[in-house]
Amino acid sequence: MLQTNLGEIRALAENSDPIIADPPNIKLLTAPLPNLGSDPNFFDLTPNDDAFQLANGILRNTPGGLRALDGNDFVRGSGGAELMNGNSGTDTLIGGCGSDTIRGGQDFDILYGECGSDFVSGDQGDDYVYGGTANDFIRGGKGNDALVGESGNDTLIGDAGIDRLWGSEGADVFVLRTEVGATSGEIGSLQPPPSGNFDVDEVPADFILDYNPAEGDVIGLAGGLTRNDIVLSERFLTIGDARDYESSGPFPPGGIRTTEFRILNTKATVIREASSGNILGLVKDVSPDQLQFISVSDGAIALG
């Protein structure tokens, strides 16, 4: 049965967030949809554009969780632990309160764990992935993603592509991985650029934008690398659009952006693999001696 009482929908969204507003057509979903031929292990939505708030416990008997299927879908979870899969289309999936597992699937998605210790993965496409409160495990998958831990001690893994990472509050682990096709070329300059410089540097690797040593942030090295296997250098960069590299977080997805392109002159530490010279990542506004590193096993980051 479907209901459209928005007051009841809002009451069920126990920790409604200010980041992502509900669409006006959202409905409360209290029972499976009549999708003939669906796999009983999954809770399938329709192949159209759906907008649902999940009632508590609605996914309890479907071990494979929710599949949004085709369409540009909006799903807000309940207060329980839920498994959601966006599949194809531009989807917005919000976990709600509970330790949720959320995967975007194909295309551009906006994913938000909200409250609870969540696993959130963009999978394919250029995604926005937010952890929310508690200690979250966040990964980008393929594509150029924006990852935001928010509060709690989070683990952020960009995976493939050139990603932007914000840990926000808490002691966060930013995991850098070696990638096929990584560049070993030089970037930026040793001195600040002259006033009026508009020669923009291409960001070649994952960019950590709010590393905070005072909060206990560390950088995790994957692939068997240790601190002895990397070299650090400090460079001055000219990058843009500046709104995509603010230390406070990404420009809101769907936000109205004025047309002018904005330049940011900043300083960053460049992290390279010593043996190949390949750039593993960059860290904004932090000097090399402020960075702390740990080695992370492939098993520790295999979740996905």
Identify the function of each model-found stretch.
Residues 1-40, 237-304:
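Low-complexity acidic/polar repeat-biased segments
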Residues 56-67, 72-76, 81-235:
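Acidic, glycine-rich calcium-binding repeat modules characteristic of RTX/beta-roll
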Residues 1-59, 63, 70, 173-190, ...:
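GD-rich hexapeptide-repeat beta-solenoids
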Residues 51, 216, 266-270:
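A generic structural signal for beta-strand entry/edge sites
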